[in-house]
């Protein structure tokens, strides 16, 4: 990173306005709302009937500030999950509507929208830690523990007003780790870029398109080589072959054999080149 970029980054790092969406909403440049409202009073009254209870009111200026600020910080530091989440909420509009429409056309999707189940540690089955690693639930549990993740850490959706739209985004965040397990893709930077390609083709979310295009530029040469020549083609093929994954109630499949569950979904897992080469070497030495 050059000196000018360092100066910009440090200024953003020290700025609560750009690094904290709550601060932008509550304190960010208190402009007269009548010049920046995005919906009419009539529309607001209609939306209140199906309003996300966690929604934080924001105006047009604040939306722009959040979008630009979160995009900049997420690019500089992809590890900032809160900024990545904010960017997703700010840019997801049409894609989220399309995702919801696909769910409404499917019986399981409609059930999910109606019941709005959450993926939390408190909703895990009591025996999940006892499930074999060959099962979907057992593989998921061990994958989460191995990488130190918890579904409880997923950011709550607060910038999408419609309750169903907000749930679609929340559900997408919470099933992200399921897709990693089904894909057999590691959660390192290279793996996340590959999953972003897969997710963009499944969901159409602009945030994933941005990550899938810019991501390879941040990879090493070797990582980029496997990513471009193998992982991205896999993501394209697998995303097209499998069912629409937002219409899957994963909670009903904890005890399913992982490979059988993949087959049921027509999900093609990824095989790393290192694993393929290792298997070839083992076979030759036998």
Curated annotation (Swiss-Prot):
EC no. given is 4.1.1.130
Compartment(s) where it occurs, according to its Swiss-Prot or TrEMBL record: Mitochondrion inner membrane
Q: Which GO terms describe its cellular component?
A: extrinsic component of mitochondrial inner membrane; mitochondrial inner membrane; mitochondrion
What membrane topology does the annotation report for this chain? Peripheral membrane protein
Cofactor requirement: Zn(2+)
Which pathway does the protein contribute to? Cofactor biosynthesis; ubiquinone biosynthesis
- Which positions in this protein are listed as binding Zn(2+)? 176-177, 180, 192
Quaternary context: Component of a multi-subunit COQ enzyme complex.
Q: Which family does it belong to?
A: Belongs to the COQ4 family.
Q: What is this protein called?
A: Ubiquinone biosynthesis protein COQ4 homolog, mitochondrial
In its UniProt entry, the species of origin is given as Dictyostelium discoideum (Social amoeba)
